[in-house]
Curated annotation (Swiss-Prot):
Stated name of the protein: Shikimate kinase
Name of one Pfam family that matches: GHMP_kinases_C
GO cellular component, one term: cytoplasm
Biological or metabolic pathway of the protein: Metabolic intermediate biosynthesis; chorismate biosynthesis; chorismate from D-erythrose 4-phosphate and phosphoenolpyruvate: step 5/7
Binding site for ATP: 86-96
Originating organism: Aeropyrum pernix (strain ATCC 700893 / DSM 11879 / JCM 9820 / NBRC 100138 / K1)
Biological process according to GO: amino acid biosynthetic process; aromatic amino acid family biosynthetic process; chorismate biosynthetic process
Lineage of origin: Archaea, Thermoproteota, Thermoprotei, Desulfurococcales, Desulfurococcaceae
UniProt record similarity statement: Belongs to the GHMP kinase family. Archaeal shikimate kinase subfamily.
Length: 280
């Protein structure tokens, strides 16, 4: 059995709202996949904080397709996935799942590939597996690389690795009891705020990814109608706050995590805290 892990993260630029560019930064929240070859069988389970879930065969087949494009071909897989954070809430869990499966298959077959190539291979198959709307190259790259990224999700290109900043900040994340699976996503509320996402993308490409995250987060909060909560997080000292990804999770980046946690707990959210993964 081979194993590999990939990280969850936060949105820098929401590619659903922008329409082309995306950005993400990895957190110290992990998904670990353990795989073995099982000819003719595509089966697995994902163990999450919200219980055990069956992995759809299409997800395992997509991971195998991506790995085979890098020279690691299998005719079937059994997998056990351990997810250390709630899935389906905008914390890049789907990308971390697929990326970790691809990396695990590469290790199973003894094939070495740079993380950026594994991320690209995973992103190319993610839409067909029902794991993303845009291909989510930003999320897959952030899950495997040790730096924040800006990507062209339509052109499938990593445009920029960003400075590894943010180590004085804690990500305080409010997770509601409901999920927002990809198959139920309505992109139109996000696309109504495309000008804000354009501004976030310009900031990100200039290397100013923390301000970009702030702009994108507020745009997401407007899209989902939680701008009042984002405002309260700023009042509590957040450097950036809003909705991450497709939501419904709400985040604050702050040097005062207790204050942000109290705001989120008062609003009825479960609180998860993490730091950027390059910060140790």
């Amino acid at each position: 059995m081979a194993r590999a892990r990939a990280s969850g993260g936060l949105t820098i630029v929401n590619a659903i709202g922008h329409g082309r560019l995306g950005g993400a930064a990895g957190l110290g929240l992990w998904v670990e996949s353990r795989v073995r070859e099982a000819r003719g069988l595509w089966a697995g389970v994902s163990l999450t904080p919200r219980g055990e879930r069956r992995l759809p065969p299409r997800v395992l087949e997509a991971a195998a397709t991506a790995a085979c494009s890098l020279g690691a071909c299998v005719e079937g897989l059994e997998a056990e996935v351990h997810t250390g954070f709630p899935p389906g809430v905008g914390l890049k869990g789907s990308a971390a799942l697929l990326a970790s499966l691809v990396e695990a298959v590469l290790r199973l077959k003894g094939v070495r590939a740079p993380p950026w190539r594994a991320a690209l291979a995973a992103a190319r198959v993610s839409r067909g597996a029902g794991l993303s709307v845009t291909g989510a190259l930003d999320d897959h790259a952030a899950s495997l690389l040790e730096a924040p990224v800006i990507t062209d999700n339509r052109g499938m290109a990593i445009l920029r690795l960003l400075p590894r900043d943010g180590c004085r900040l804690t990500a305080v994340i409010g997770v509601p009891g409901v999920e927002n699976p990809v198959e139920n996503l309505d992109p139109s509320p996000f696309r109504r705020h495309s000008r804000l996402y354009d501004a976030a993308a310009r900031l990100g490409l200039a290397g100013e990814w923390l301000p970009a995250m702030a702009v994108s987060g507020v745009a997401g909060a407007l899209a989902l109608g939680v701008e009042g909560l984002a405002s309260r997080l700023y009042e509590a000292g957040a450097a950036a706050a809003g909705v991450t990804g497709k939501g419904p999770a709400v985040f604050a980046l702050t040097e005062r995590p207790r204050g942000a946690a109290e705001v989120l707990e008062t609003a009825g959210y479960e609180v998860v805290e993490a730091r950027f993964k390059w910060c140790g």
